[in-house]
Amino acid sequence: MEEYFSIIQFLIEAVKAGASDEHLMVGHPPYMRKNGFIEKTEHPVISKGELDGAILEIAPTAIRDEILTLCDVDFMYEIKGCSRFRINYNRQLGLPALVIRNIPYEIPKLKDLSLPDILSSIVKQPNGIVLVTGPTGSGKSTTIASLVNEINETEAKHIVTIEDPIEYVFDSAKSIVSQRQVEVDTKTFADGIKYSLRQDPDVIFIGEIRDKETMSAALKAAETGHLVLSTLHTNDAVQTINRVVNMFDEANRAIVRKQLAETLRATIAQKLVYSEKLNKRFPACEVMVVTSTIKDYLTKDNTEAIYDILRDSNIDDMITMNASLAKLVESELITQEEALQHSNDTSELEKIFRGVYQGT
């Protein structure tokens, strides 16, 4: 008789251990990611039968009978009183595997995330687009959920979210929050945005902008007077602008640049950096607030010059990623070596360090 692997008990254990992600593969013990690092657990190796059973135990009813024949599926699972989990079912070398992201019930307050104070002002904008960007695992989902909840708790608005899948669940507070899941409540992100415009929204949160159809719908929503929040997998403001523009055919890019110049309010690029001193991670953030000069550069396709404004500006609460990393080093939260690992321009950061530590 095959030994039973309790995925429920394992996930409860992982949450208690402070893990952010879990990896389950046939022929390997379970792994957890803690503070950004993968750790092998002391659990025994998982057999195919055990993992098949675990998958069937947590799979949604609608796909339970067929999930083991599929290749890639994303779904949510909840352990009451513990946490929600975003589950990615996939196959590796012909065998099933799970990658799991823990989604806590409680949405952190902005003030508790060690993020720049300007973020709470950015989401007070009545309209336009705000983009939170960064690589996978950089804390984008947590940051943008905190931004949405800041609006929810402080303003009388109607917030519509369009997600795939729904991660954080918002309890309507001062605002009303309507959450819609792609392929469950709406066909696509673009359709969700299009039809949300008929649902009396003030704020539209798009889980991720993946294609030009979604981006076009987001631009239209912003142009028609709504505040649009979303995420992209880009590392800085310049890369974000270029990614958006390059989603479109060359013939349409000038129009898109003009639309973006009129609607983009801010970009927030972030990374999570490890503090060995405190055994936890802190966000390093680049913040770009769109000014009249940046609008002009956007329209004229001079995006590379935008970084110079960020680097040289001491106003408008803007900051580069390197300046943010240097502040964490100066505060003795992280080492120079850790900062350099996360820098988009290590030579510039080294110059900053020489200035910060001059004479010491």
Where are these regions (language model features)?
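Short, flexible helix-loop junctions that flank or precede catalytic/ligand sites
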Residues: 1-360
